[in-house]
Amino acid sequence: MFRFTLLLTILSTSIFAQKVSPVYPIPSAKQLAWSELEYYGFIHFNMNTFTNVEWGEGKESPSSFNPSALDCNQWARIAKKAGMKGLILTVKHHDGFALYPSKYTTHSVAKSPWKNGKGDVVKDLSEACKKYGLKLGIYLSPWDRFHPDYGTDKYNQVYAKMQEELLTNYGPIFEFWYDGANGEGPNGRKQVYDWPLFHSMVNKYQPNAVQFSDAGPDIRWVGNERGYAYDTMWSPILRDKIYPGCLDFDNYRNGQENGTHWVSPEVDVSIRPGWYYHPDQDDKVKTPDSLLKIYVASVGRNANLLLNIPVDTRGLIHENDSASLMGFAAIRAKSLVNLLKGNSVDPLFDGKNSTYWMASEKNNLIKVDLNFVQKVNTIMLQEPIALGQRVSSFEVELVDETGIKEVIKSGTIGHKRMITFKERKLKSFQIRFTGSRGPVLISNLEAYRFISTRNEPLFQ
């Protein structure tokens, strides 16, 4: 790794690591731990894989589910090499087919020819995640187009019992994922979901797991499936104003500066056009460069990245998807070399979220003078979010080797914010905070040169 040995001059009137009062709301311990994960995988693999559709109807024969070479160790091994921290599995999608032998549905792997009806994909993945040091998450669609009780009060108990099975038999769960889709069941009726019951099951059996839906309660949908968060991205949100399937969710997707609850955003996006595997999309896998841009636009905008990898009919991650993930991991590692690291004992550069710089009443400016010009195209900031999210707006002034200045204005920071720009040889830069809920606190400041697979600047 090329190592810079320059000195940094920090010009600011500031207080370092002084204890300050939180600005509420603040994250719980499990929400804080979840934010540190940043990047993990979604595994869409179920009946739809074999029927070549995105949404099944619940009328599919269990005999259709018969992977020829299912290997959860392969999934976990690739995810680990890709730098992911965990995997979330679609245990039951809208068609109702369950990937484990549940006592509460007859539509499951127990009725399939795979392993003569003795298989359990959830068990296999749980063991693989443990082997490779990954966390396990569960996606369990509340909508069920197969179950005869769907559309009645009894179904809520069925769903809760399936939750209990999944939450008590497969080890620690880090995230429980509720899909917002709610359509008709086999009897033509829709279900009124008992969300308080569903939430209570997770809190009872897996208290350290965060729960995802449009409206939380712990983490929320970012509002699109295209792989990006927004320039303004608050973790606080008016949670009591939204609900799963909320029709005016677009009005709340950015979060709110005056939000009442801490519910951080998650970006979900697929490596292919579809969520499930389709053979005609083998040549449409997102490139490593595209994935890196998605990473910056999600993790770099105060959100976590949930990247979907569709498993194919063999029960394996396809070679094209694996190759792209490995390429993404390689250029991400090369790009995330902090050009400011090791140059100061200042809390801004120690890599810890527990220490921070605090702006004074007289000066809200950080200036970094570089003794040697460096090629830079990204500046990253972090707030110590355990004390709340504070910054609502700021601007970065770049000064290149010729003395030419450029000012970039931006919105929120939160857990992590990456400001990208056309590569330039920087002589210095400064950050001015123009809006904040309380005293500005910055725990980390880094600079990068993001590159493409062609070893060229990523941002042109």
Please place each PLM-identified region on the residue numbering.
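Bacterial Sec-dependent N-terminal signal peptides
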Residues: 1-19
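Short, Lys/Arg-enriched, disordered terminal segments
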Residues: 1-3, 453-460
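Mature catalytic domains of secreted/periplasmic carbohydrate-active enzymes
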Residues: 18-362, 367-394, 398-400, 406-421, ...
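Short, conserved beta-strand segments of beta-strand-rich sandwich/propeller modules, principally
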Residues: 428-430
